[in-house]
Amino acid sequence: MTTPISTSRAASIVSSILPYSRYLKRVLENESELQQELLEQLHNPFTREEMLGFLQDSTAHLIDEADLHRLLRQLRKRVILRLAARDLAGLADLNEVMATMTALADVTIQFSLEFLHAAMVQPGHFGKPKGEKTGTEQQLLIVAMGKLGGGELNVSSDVDLVFIYPEDGETDGSKSITNHEFFLRLGRKLIASLNDYTVDGYVFRVDMRLRPYGENSPLAISLPMLEDYFVTQGREWERHAWIKSRVITGSSIAEAALMELIVRPFVFRKYLDFEAYEAMRSLHTQLRKEVDRRELHDNIKLGPGGIREIEFITQVFQLIRGGRDADLCIRPTLGVLQRLKQKQPLPEQTVEELIEAYYFLRKLEHRLQYLDDQQTQNLPQHSDDQILIAKSMGFTDYTGFLKHLDLHRQNVTRHFEQIFAVRRKAIKLGTFARIRPEQTNDNEIVKVFSNQLKTLGYIDPDKITARVQQFYDGTTFRQLSHPNQERILELMPTLMEVVTRFPPVEITLERMLRLLEKIGQYSAYLALLQEYPQTLPRVAKLVSISQWASDYLGSHPILLDELLAPSGLHTLPDWPTLKTELIHQLHHGNIPKAQIIEWQMDVLRHFQHAQVFRLLAVDLEGNLLLETLSDHLTALADLILDNVLQLAWQGLKKKHRKSPAFAIIGYGKLGGKELGYVSDLDIVYLYQDNHPDAMEIYTKLAQNINLWLTSHTSAGVLYETDLRLRPNGTSGLLVNSIEAFSLYQHEQAWVWEHQALTRARFVIGDSEVGEKFEQMRKNILCQPRDMENLKREILMMRTKMLEAHPNSTPLFDVKHDHGGIIDVEFIVQYLVLGYAHRYPQLTSNIGNIALLKLAGELGLTSAEKANAAFIAYRELRRTQHQLRLSGIPEATGTALPKDVSQKFARVTSDYLSSARRAVFQLWEDVFGT
């Protein structure tokens, strides 16, 4: 609440600030009745409600458009008087100034439109415009652009407007005209009500040049015309212009939402749009030429280091990332800067300096305009005005003021040039090897290229030259658009040099070329590599180590963005923080309702892919235990399942309670917390609910969950799922009550199903259902069993698994063959099922290594052999993991095809002989065979 100011104090304040505004002084001298009103209300901001009240109090006296013009101008005069006085006196901050001017524009436009529309549809006139398809009455959608759209209007600003109407059709009055003609006439009248200069002044100058097709086009167009324009003719600079667009009038929220469906996809691409850099450079170059031509170097908006450059900085990040990050799809410049500060695509100090400069420049802009109520951003040339401006900005002299101004402008210029630097021009020639497709048959040029490769350090330059020729001659490259071919050609010299740093060079080059083939159709990602050439060595390093990393990047090229700030790639995830971040992303998208599910699906996939990629980067550094990696991959899956369960439940139309009495049970690698990068999720769904429709509801919920996980969207898949471990397998019910599941486990389950239960755990969902499952699991595992029968059943199952995965090669299959991973898992499962009735601690879900150690400590098998076996198990899993990552099991001495090495992880029989021996010895100790 504002503190009242006495009239005498207010008079003193007004007197002190009048030298800084000749406009205020002139108005108060000519219209003395406004002075008392100003003194009485100086302590109060001029609110939207007060503006509306002023207009509505005079509605009864409005007869014609002349009355409307007069009333709007009287309001404008009062608002400017109080706002200027409050601002110059230090009673209003920048946010109040921008908000008040924006409110004035919104209120006057809306009031004027309502009055004029009502007059045009009166009986005996044109009548109401009706849509030819819907038959509903049509209203003019006025789209505020620029500073008005962003809620940051200055005190003597144009208002940039675009007029849209929903449908073509005709009016229903006696003087029927087309909707197009109706809204043209309405638009002209509205512009006149704001823009025309009368004895009472004006309200706002109106600029319509941002409308589709520009100033030579119709004043108003239909929504279908707008959509067609964006799809067929929309230009890059118009994406920049429409960032701040805001619908300020219209007949319904639905029409505003329709605008969102049309405008948002045009402005914000679904991918990371690094091409925006080049578009912004081009736009800024044009602006600089205009500044030079018009000699606007002292213009604090358009000149170097001015307001426009700050806006360009914020908007380039919005255009690049807004399609992925809805937090950046906001309008105010300061708001975007604050979010850039939080998200840190720019250093915090950079953002702070930009914010400080923006505040200073906008404050100065307003003081320049207060002088004579002129739309100017030029520094004054007359010495008297220079002194006034300096003092109004809090400086004793103009020299000191200029020094401070120059500091801000230099900061803005420096940051702008760093962000928009033409990095590609920095590629030096020297020894960089380059050859173009049309030159691959020119023997002389090919020879020069080969010599350049030799200089760079390539051992077999002729072979590499042939591979590059093959790349250029390949169908994939030839089918790319010409601009994308040129982008790749610009990248190639740098790529050829970078590859030499990461042996084995031939393999690294091959993977880089294949990666380029995969991402070559996406100009945005090629632009990323051009704008940030430092990412190329980071990519080369990853792919040189891992074929799987190369394939993953090729499948999800959006992950190249993760390499821009590599510091984040070298730290393990903070899951509580990431959980908060994911929830925010999922539920703060400001996405049209019709698109929200697709949006959330993509958010989940982008999040999951990014976390996997970050873990991969840490993993490839060689400092991450496989168990730790699996723990993190499992934590990621748990987090995804938690959110998917909630989203799937929210999406159910038929439900009878706030939250489901439902649990997701993890089996296999998910249950045992041993997930790898591409592991399926083995899942069973349970519920406990006596509602008569419970089975139907939870079946639909389970189907929805599976849909969320396995659907192929533009961002790929979250997880493949395996639901076959539920009671009766694929022929069984998709969901089971906890009672039915317990009965099945006690009376019908096979031994192999109890083996699977040893690795099961409650993952997410209703805690009561989860607790009952865990208790039931423990009861089942702790049942006394006939040891000979148990042994026979487990050995039979092991034989079946060997038959299902025959190995006809002389190589050792690390997972499936005897002495491998599955042998260890079967040993553990046998010990748990055989002895848990005596040692319930064996039912703890602590992983195979810890259970082997515990079995040895309990004397269930030789402690020495158990310890040797868990060391072997760790080595087997590590080898399997490394082979699948590399795609080339170099340790075997055999270059296997990728599909074989990655699917089966096989090595020469002598490579893991000590580990196999340890497993064999424990197997013999436990099973006697």
UniProtKB/Swiss-Prot annotation:
Regions that span the bilayer: none
Annotated EC: 2.7.7.89, 2.7.7.42
Chain spans, region Adenylyl removase: 1-422
Catalytic activity: [glutamine synthetase]-O(4)-(5'-adenylyl)-L-tyrosine + phosphate = [glutamine synthetase]-L-tyrosine + ADP; [glutamine synthetase]-L-tyrosine + ATP = [glutamine synthetase]-O(4)-(5'-adenylyl)-L-tyrosine + diphosphate
Region span, Adenylyl transferase: 429-929
GO MF term list: [glutamate-ammonia-ligase] adenylyltransferase activity; [glutamine synthetase]-adenylyl-L-tyrosine phosphorylase activity; ATP binding; magnesium ion binding
GO terms for biological process, alphabetical: regulation of glutamine family amino acid metabolic process
A family per Pfam: GlnD_UR_UTase
Keyword annotations from UniProtKB, A to Z: ATP-binding, Magnesium, Multifunctional enzyme, Nucleotide-binding, Nucleotidyltransferase, Transferase
InterPro entries in alphabetical order: GlnE, GlnE_rpt_dom, NT_sf, PII_UdlTrfase/GS_AdlTrfase
Cofactor: Mg(2+)
Functional description taken from the UniProt entry: Involved in the regulation of glutamine synthetase GlnA, a key enzyme in the process to assimilate ammonia. When cellular nitrogen levels are high, the C-terminal adenylyl transferase (AT) inactivates GlnA by covalent transfer of an adenylyl group from ATP to specific tyrosine residue of GlnA, thus reducing its activity. Conversely, when nitrogen levels are low, the N-terminal adenylyl removase (AR) activates GlnA by removing the adenylyl group by phosphorolysis, increasing its activity.
Family membership: Belongs to the GlnE family.
HAMAP family named in the record: GlnE
The name this protein goes by in its record: Bifunctional glutamine synthetase adenylyltransferase/adenylyl-removing enzyme
Organism: Nitrosomonas eutropha (strain DSM 101675 / C91 / Nm57)
Chain's gene name: glnE
